[in-house]
């Protein structure tokens, strides 16, 4: 867990920046696989404006029949697919203010190197929304275990190096509201893309996954092969939004 101010300080000092990038790369590859950054977006009013933009997009898309998530039950959540482009088109200045975060830049560079490309989707888990099924993401995570098994093992090992997963909190996230469940070190399990839907593995995840409370503007970044899933939103009023 790191403070946003430490990250911003390191961003402007070459040696400290390189030390931080090296540390994070090691965490993503062979450590817990996860870092958290408090106050990753320094000015939370930027987050508030983005939240308003996202809510307006969600409401507009609902009128056109947009549905939520392939890893959650219908009605549990709302999604904005390709929120990056939609955000930019709706409010270019807020888009710039939001994505100029040093935390986003350094976390991405630590794992992907320079010249990475950003994609984004919004997930808003509504009050009473049930947890997602635990899963991995990109690129082998969006198919059955039987299908992913048709790729050789070295592809399973390579795939997580092509993407970094991250999320910015758009509201305060208590444990009761169900912040993302994560299974530290699970990126080290080479067969994870094949076995993640296995009932035995799902039960292991349920028993051992961890959560951290987040406040608005905090961020979490993790190796996409880390088993994860949105938690149960047990609140009656919190619409838990992350981008």
Set out the residue ranges of the language-model regions.
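Non-heme Fe(II)-dependent double-stranded beta-helix
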Residues: 1-146
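A short hydrophobic beta-strand segment most commonly corresponding to one strand
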Residues: 184, 236-243
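A structural signal for short, well-ordered beta-strand segments
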Residues: 120-122, 166-168, 242
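Catalytic micro-motifs at enzyme active sites that drive phosphoryl/nucleotidyl and oxygen chemistry
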Residues: 23-25, 153-156
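Asparagine-centered strand-capping/turn motif at beta-strand->loop junctions
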Residues: 232-233
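Beta-sheet entry/capping signal
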Residues: 32-35, 115-116, 179-180, 218-220, ...
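Double-stranded beta-helix
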Residues: 147-151, 157-229
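Short, solvent-exposed loop/turn segments at the edges of secondary structure
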Residues: 131-133, 161-163, 237
